[in-house]
Structure formats: structure tokens, C-alpha cells
Amino acid sequence: MRFFRVIAALTLLAMAIASARAANLPRRSPDFAINLGQGKQVRISQYKGKTVVVAFILTYCSHCQKAIGVLSKMQREYGARGLQVLASATEEMAAAALPGFLRQFDPPFPVGINTATEFITYMQHPTMLQLIMPGLVFIDKDGIIRAQYEGRDTFLEETGVEKNIRAKVEEMLAPPAAAPKKAGAKKGVAKKSN
């Protein structure tokens, strides 16, 4: 009997954690600003009408570096179709680390800096749960966050990250499905009048 109580308690705890870490999706993206240095910023609202992917990274994180490589490829392939990638380093020493990171990876999109608190607030990540990097946010052409992932999500597993990001980008760039046509009277069939 004690065993079943422990299992029940662990199940409830797991469900509470899962619901606590779930951000509200879909939701309108706040007009988040990424600091580019020298008083310059890039704002998400500048890209209304485009599909935007925001990557939150740590410059020294190998998974983040891999994500930046994949996103660089996506920007080059899909930029002309309306994709815009942005990235933000969130570690304490990001200002010192970012120039070397940019020289090494040469991403074809803006990369700046935000505090961890700004990033956690933007992603609606519970402060009581450890955040695993990177964080990716997918925003549609109307400014709605449709999906977001963090390092612990299977979406960002090393073996499938490029395939998963590509599929999500293609899904978001696809034209909306046409609404089904309403069924009406068939053409060429006359109704009999009585």
C-alpha cells in the first residue's frame, strides 16, 4: 500500500512540474528587444510579416553553438521566403564573449545580449525549474508565438535538431490552408417546382 502512495505522489509531482513549466501557447509575442551594443537594439516588432526564430544561447554551450550553426543554414536557405533569425546571448559575461563567438560562427543574422531574467520572463519559464539551453522561440508572421523549446526538449536532441528545426520553419512558412468550400446546389441540376 505504501508503494502505491509513493507512486501516486510521484505522479502528481511530475504532473505539477510539467504544467508549471508549460508556457501559454499560442500567445502574442511581447515586443522583445535584443541589445546589439553601442546603444543599438533589434526589436521583434521590426519583423512583423516575417516568420521569426529567436535563439537564446550561452556562447560557450556546445548545444547552443550547434543550434546557431543550424539556424545560420536556415537563414541562408529560407531568408528570401520570409524567415528572420535573431539570437541573444544570456550569460553574465556575454558582452566580453560575444565578439569572439561572432568571429568563430559568423551568423548571417543579428546576435546580441539580454539578461537571463529578461529571457526567462519572455519564455514564461518558471523560476523554480532549471533552464537548459538553448531556448528557441518560433513566432509567426502575425507576431504570435506558436512554439518554443528549451535544451531538455526532445526537439533539440543532438541527432534530430536540424531535421526538427527545418520541419518547424517549413511548417511556419507554408501558406495557410484554404478554407473548405461550402457545399451548395449542384450546377446543372434544376429543381422541380410543384
Model-identified regions with their sequence ranges:
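Hydrophobic beta-strand anchors of alpha/beta hydrolase catalytic cores
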Residues: 53-54, 85, 136
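Non-globular targeting/processing and membrane-anchoring segments
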Residues: 21-24, 29, 168-194
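Bacterial N-terminal signal peptides that target proteins for export
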Residues: 1-8
